Amino acid sequence: MNERSINRVELQGRVGTVRIQSIGDQMVSTFSLQTNHFYTLNDGSAKVCETAWHCICAYESEDVVTAGLTRGSLVHLEGRLRTNRYTAADGSERTFTEVIAATLRVVE
C-alpha cells in the first residue's frame, strides 16, 4: 500500500512541565503544551475559552535545551501524531497520543 497520507500537526501555546533526559546517545525532551481555542456561544451570550493540553516529545532537539524552554514559555512547533499502547497496572489496555516535534521555536 503506497497511498499518500498526511500526518502533520502545528501548535502554538504555553509550556507546562518540562522533562529532559538522555537515553543512551539520544536526548529526549518531553513536555506538556497548553493551547486555547476561543469561540462565542451560538446565542452570542458569552465567549468561551476551551483549553487543551498536549503531550510533546522532541528527540535530539537541541532547540529545547539551548532555547531555555521553561514553564510558561510560548512555543511554536510542527510535528506529527503518534499513538502508543500500554498495559495499565490493572491489566487494561490503554492508548495515548503524543506529538513528535520536528521543529520547535520559542516565541517568547
Where in this protein do the model-derived segments appear?
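Single-stranded nucleic acid-binding surfaces, predominantly the OB-fold ssDNA-binding core
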Residues: 1-108
